[in-house]
Structure formats: C-alpha cells, structure tokens
Amino acid sequence: MLSHANFCANAQSASGLIALAPGTVFVSVLPLSHAYEFTVGLLLPLLCGCRVAYVGRTPTPAIVQKICSHERPQVVLVAPLILEEIYKKRVMAQLENNRTMGFFCRFDSIRKLFFRKAGLRLMDFFGGRLRLLGIGGAALNPEIERFLLQASLPFVLGYGVSEASPLLAAGPVGDPGIAPGSTGKAVRNVRLRIDNPDPETGIGEIQAQGPNIMQGYLNDPEATKAALVEDGWLRTGDLGRLDEAGNLFICGRLNSVIVLASGENIYPEAIEHKLNAMPFVQESLVRENMGILEALVYPDADWLDSRTRGDHRAKRQEYLNRLLNEMRREVNESLPISSRINRVLVWPEPFSKTATHRIKRFLYTL
C-alpha cells in the first residue's frame, strides 16, 4: 500500500536530479501501471509544469523514434532492454558491417570518436533536444553504460522498488562524484544501508528508509512484518554494496543468487549482461541445472537471417552452434572459474517478462 504522501515525497526527491522548467517535454515509454513511470514520468512532470507525450503501444525502437521525432522531447524515460536493442542495431551493427571501422575501433581513441559520432545520431533519434535519458526498471548492461559515457549522452540511472514509490538512488546530472557502474547515491530524504555485508566483498541486502516507504502489503500483515524491519527500514530483496562516497552498486536479486555446492555465490545477472552484449543474442537467462551453470539464449533472428540467407537449415544450425561455442569460450575467459558456463541452450521464444521488461526468472528455474 502506497499513500498519496509516499508518492508525493518521492516525486519531490526526484525533482532534485535535474532542473525542469515549465513546458519541458517528456516522452513516456514505460506503462503507467509501473511505479517508476507513475512517479518519475507523471507526478514529477506535473509537479514541475511539464508536458508528457505517451507512446500508447509496445515501445519498439521504431515507434519510440517516431514519437520522439514528432514531440522532440527534452526528457525520455526508458527501460534498459530498449536501449540495448538500439545499441545493437544502430551502433554495433555499423561496426560489424564495416570491417575496416571494426578493426580501428579496437583502439580506444578511435572507438571513443566513433561512439561520440554515434551519440550525435542517437540525439537525432530522440528528437534532437534531449537533456536527460532516464534509465530505470531493470539493471543496465555495463557495456551500454560505457557507450553512453563515451558518446556524451546525458543520462541518469535510477534504482528503486515498488515498495519505495519507487525511487531510492540515482545519479544527479553533472555530479562528478557518481561512480561508473553504480546507480548513483540515495535521493533526497532517503537513507540506504547494507544489511549483513559480506566481510570480503561488502555485498549484502539493500535496505532503505524514508517518507516514500510503503505502509505495508494489503491484508497481509505477515509479509509486511517480513519486509519492514525496525524503525521503518525496508528490505528491498536486492543485493548490493555502497562505496565510501555513498554510491550504490547493484549485484542482483537476493532470490536469484545461485549458490553452488562449493558454497560460491553466483550472480546470474552479471553473466547475462556479458551474453547479451553479443550481437546475435536477443536475450539470455542463466540458471543452475543439476549442479552446473546453464545459459538459455534466445537468438536475434534478424541478425542470423542477414548472415545465413540462402543457407539450408542444417548449415544455419551449424553456424549458430559455432557462434554459441565461441561465445561460451569468450565469456568464460572473462569470468572466475566458479562462474563459468558449462552449457548453452537455444531458447525457442522470447522470455516472459514483467511490465518493465524484467524476465520472470521464476518461470525458468528448475
């Protein structure tokens, strides 16, 4: 149960992230049924006298571009999955199709220059007047974050949970103290802490306190008691750590951590980010299957079609199997031994997701 006061307090906190003048145009991409869009995409604009344009249908990149070209917004709120698709099909596809450019982009200085130019094209994609790209609803792939930084696109990562109305942490625009890879610091009037942190990594459950924290779960006192601990601190169910400056780093969901027989904790989201960075991977999910780590991969059919057009089914499958084996080898080289993938399976359809494009992991757990 979220009160009027909870939502208003959170909208006030969000207003400290960027100065919004009356008449500023927002484009709403996420559904209003989600607390992030309701607070940051509706209440915040109303609080500041802004105008909101709604997509009104499934927000594919083509539809987002169309409405942005028409409305020319200064603020766009998106889910990471949409950004990943734009990045793969409008940025990385150019490197794959131009071998010379792909070769030279292995050099950091040239890659930064390429990304800067790609950033200018993405500014046009969003209508040419973008002042803020607000990213929330799920974790952002680190590779996408590096691109946004090198492309000089104005973006803010937000972190929150519905029980907190939902915003808990974000990186105020222009704050040099925001650490790359983090979701920024606690927003105004919110306190964060890590419960029972690991002595070596500092990772533990993220807990929050503030005027935005829920009243409880409707007609469920037991669940409320489990979620709200002493002095109104909320157990978020997310794992993370805080650095000395107060930057919050998200590691994954408490209930999605894979504990191997060796006692090692595996955070599947971190591995999935690496898999999803592959151009032929649309999305992926890592799970445990009889003591080993298994990756389910839903391939990008358009990408594969462009490279196997005219091939018969067996040859197409052989090509995909080779890609998957190379991907497993490459990803495993960047992972600790305990986190390496033992098997990769092709998943035949998109994974079932929430309204904010988070995979419903519980449907695929064995």
What is the role of each PLM region?
Residues 8-25, 32-121, 129:
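Conserved AMP-binding/adenylation subdomain of ANL enzymes
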Residues 74-77, 87-177, 282:
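Gly/Ser/Thr-rich phosphate-binding loop
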Residues 200-260, 265:
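Conserved ATP-binding/catalytic segment of the ANL
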Residues 213, 247-276, 303-318, 336-341:
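Adenylate-forming
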Residues 258, 283, 291-294, 326-366:
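Conserved C-terminal "lid"/linker of ANL adenylate-forming enzymes
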